[in-house]
Curated annotation (Swiss-Prot):
Belongs to the polyribonucleotide nucleotidyltransferase family. One of its GO terms (biological process) is RNA processing. This is Polyribonucleotide nucleotidyltransferase. Residues 623-691 form the S1 motif domain. The keyword Metal-binding applies. It comes from Ruminiclostridium cellulolyticum (strain ATCC 35319 / DSM 5812 / JCM 6584 / H10).
Length: 703
């Protein structure tokens, strides 16, 4: 049965419609937020998937270009693979809902959000997040929700809930926040060096709005929600776990306390073989369940050690960072490079400087724009000791690259100050946790090595969490998580920023949410960590950006011309600009507002091209004298090029003081002569006089 529900969200009406569309899904809803419309659905398989040890959830955010009245480009004329923005939005929706499903559920669950109409003032990502929450909550799929979501902006010191397009352009931060009525489940932020306390207060304000959304969704569930289905738990049988625990607990404790990752993995692997052999007769054909029990035991040992001993399995204090090191100038031919190491995590980042014509064009359902600063993140198999081939970036790689990108954008000089495009690439060479934050630190090193005048160094670090499952009020937060603490812990709270404030946040959790106190502690830990990394490591490796760019980096000269003169510089069919490029060997980019960028490693060539362009763009005025080149001779005079692409006629009567019988008696093609502009007629033709120029030259000499 069709039902419609509405609430006010940030001064605009949010409407949820159920019981009409996509009725074969387990749950579905149409979300209207202003003129933004999202179709959200949640579907579960009838039976669990065999042979897996994880919850098979997929979340998709599908952009349709008809939502903004566009026809896709290219030959096929239909949407292709998801855009980077769509992938990142899928991840933002996935992270707050995933921890709220039962951990032992093995039925496939697919959540699909289709963007059908977009009004730029009303964020489709928030409408999709709320839509996903509604679709799952009213379905029969087990779920400990609902969640709500908002975007936070900061304009003139005021926190704005779901800022419109104009407010987003002015905002010092863009924070996507999600949570249940009781706790925060997801934070994704980009900020212009916002102090930690300001960010914390904004999160608390945003949560107040989220509580209203959760109440709204709970009201919908009461009216149209289905009873949740029962499922077969995939958890380890209690009797098996007790036997495995009795046999392997002490050995597992010894194994996980090995400080070296490879040594620890080897000991755990050996213990697995011993346990399988010892229990094979008692539990026949239960090899996979024994492995699951050992995994559960390893997790228990790691968590107990942190909670009870108050320190880490590698011997560190809770607020202690692993051994740090940093180097710059690793690769001689790149424009800049930096190597950052934190324990057994090692990231090499390079920077390549390019012309403004190298910026990335972003053409999707958002307002068309360009991206000048790009960061790509690579995570090869060898970084974790695995023999596997690379199949291109997945969602994780794209997400980590975007996080590192957001972290550095606030400190990049403006286009006016430094007219370059940037491409950074982070190669993860070793991974034992927190590679995305290693990429942030590597980016700072590479940019400073390249001579980019960044506003301040940026560092990134993560905070971890272990909550006592029997007493949730007992928890421990700690700084700089390594891989095993990420696997078995409850939180990966990544924060990047300068010594003055935050530039990016990404929060992943495995529990049903975080209290304000946990978030406060995470902010304090990561702030301390940022300061230590910047002051003790980055600034000791390279105290300030290099004064000069790499000799292999292109040099850019900029100038401004009248936009009306752009067509003259380009010429018919690009003839003039191609001629300049051929003569000088430079690369030229021209913006619509008349900004011209000349890029080349050869400064002399750049100056030559600049002179030509300025000459073309210059207005020719009657009375001016030019040194021009004879380019064509006729019976009635000579055509002289006085500026690139601009020539005028010197009539035979104006060639000399005395009478001239034949043009060739005075000038030849290729001669350079002084000429004076006598007239520009109504048709734009330029009349020149050599005779007047000679007379003017003589007058000057006499003076």
């Amino acid at each position: 049965m069709f039902k419609s529900f509405s609430m006010e969200l940030a001064g605009r009406t949010l409407t949820v419609e159920t019981g009409k569309l996509a009725q074969l899904a387990n749950g579905s809803a149409l979300i209207r937020y202003g003129d933004t419309v999202i179709m959200s659905s949640a579907t579960a398989s009838a039976a669990p998937r065999d042979g897996i040890d994880f919850f098979p959830l997929s979340v998709d955010y599908e952009e349709r270009l008809y939502a903004v009245g566009k026809i896709p480009g290219g030959f096929i004329k239909r949407e292709g693979k998801p855009s980077e923005k769509a992938i990142l939005t899928s991840r933002v929706i996935d992270r707050p809902i995933r921890p709220l499903f039962p951990k032992d559920l093995r039925n496939d669950v697919a959540v699909v959000n289709t963007v059908m109409s977009v009004e730029q003032d009303n964020s489709p990502e928030i409408a999709a997040m709320i839509g996903a929450s509604v679709a799952i909550s009213i379905s029969d799929i087990p779920f400990n929700g609902p969640i709500g979501g908002v975007v936070l902006g900061l304009v003139d010191g005021e926190v704005i809930i779901n800022p419109n397009e104009e407010q987003r352009a002015k905002s010092k931060m863009y924070v996507t926040l999600a949570g249940t009525k009781e706790k925060i489940t997801m934070i994704e932020a980009g900020a212009d060096i916002v102090p930690d306390d300001v960010m914390f207060d904004a999160i608390k304000k945003g949560h107040e709005e989220i509580k209203k959304i959760c109440d709204f969704i709970n009201g919908i569930v009461k009216e149209v929600g289905k009873a949740k289905f029962t499922y077969e738990s995939a958890d380890v049988p209690a009797d098996l776990f007790e036997v495995v625990k009795e046999f392997a607990y002490d050995k597992m404790r010894i194994a996980v306390l090995a400080t070296d990752k490879q040594d620890r993995d080897a000991k755990v692997s050996q213990l697995t073989e011993e346990t399988q052999a010892a229990l094979a007769e008692q539990f026949p054909e239960m090899e996979s369940k024994i492995n699951d029990a050992l995994y559960k035991l390893e997790k228990k040992v790691v968590r107990e050690y942190i909670l009870k001993e108050g320190k880490r399995i590698d011997g560190r204090r809770l607020d202690e960072i692993r051994t740090l090191s940093a180097e710059v100038g690793i690769l001689p031919r790149t424009h800049g490079s930096g190597l950052f190491e934190r324990g057994q995590t090692q990231v090499l980042t390079t920077v390549t400087l390019g012309a403004m014509g190298d910026v990335q064009m972003l053409d999707g359902i958002d307002t068309e724009e360009t991206k000048r600063y790009m960061h790509h993140y690579n995570f090869p198999g060898y970084s974790v000791g695995e023999a596997k081939t690379s199949r291109g970036p997945g969602r994780r790689e794209i997400g980590h690259g975007a996080l590192a990108e957001r972290s550095l954008v606030p400190v990049i000089p403006t286009e006016t100050e430094f007219p370059y495009a940037f491409r950074l690439v982070s190669e993860v060479l070793m991974s034992n946790g927190s590679t995305s934050q290693g990429s942030v630190c590597g980016s700072t090193l590479a940019l400073m090595d390249a001579g980019v005048p960044i506003k301040a160094p940026v560092a990134g670090i993560s905070a971890g969490l272990v909550i006592d499952e029997e007493n949730p009020d007992n928890f421990v937060t700690f700084m700089d998580i390594q891989g095993i603490e990420d696997f078995f812990g409850d939180m990966d709270f990544k924060v990047a920023g300068t010594t003055e404030g935050i530039t990016a946040i990404q929060m992943d959790i495995k529990v049903d949410g975080l209290s304000y106190e946990i978030i406060r502690q995470a902010f304090e830990l990561t702030r301390m960590g940022r300061l230590q990394i910047i002051n003790d490591v980055i600034l000791k490796a390279i105290p300030q950006p290099r004064k000069e760019l790499s000799e292999y980096a292109p040099k850019i000269i900029t100038t401004n011309i009248d936009p009306e003169k752009i067509r003259d510089v380009i010429g018919p069919g690009g003839k003039m600009i191609n001629k300049i490029i051929a003569e000088t060997g430079v690369k030229i980019d021209i913006e619509e507002d008349g900004r011209v960028y000349i890029l080349t490693p050869d400064s002399a060539a750049a100056q030559k091209a600049l002179k030509i362009i300025q000459g073309i763009a210059k207005d020719i005025e009657p009375g001016e004298v030019y040194l021009g080149k004879v380019v064509r001779i006729t019976t009635f005079g000579a055509f002289v090029e006085i500026l690139p692409g601009k020539d005028g006629l010197v009539h035979i009567s104006k060639l000399d003081k005395k009478r001239v019988e034949k043009v060739e008696d005075v000038v030849s093609i290729g001669d350079e002569i002084l000429v004076k502009v006598t007239e520009i007629d109504k048709q734009g033709r330029i009349n020149l006089s050599r005779k007047d120029a000679m007379a003017e030259e003589n007058t000057t000499e006499e003076k």
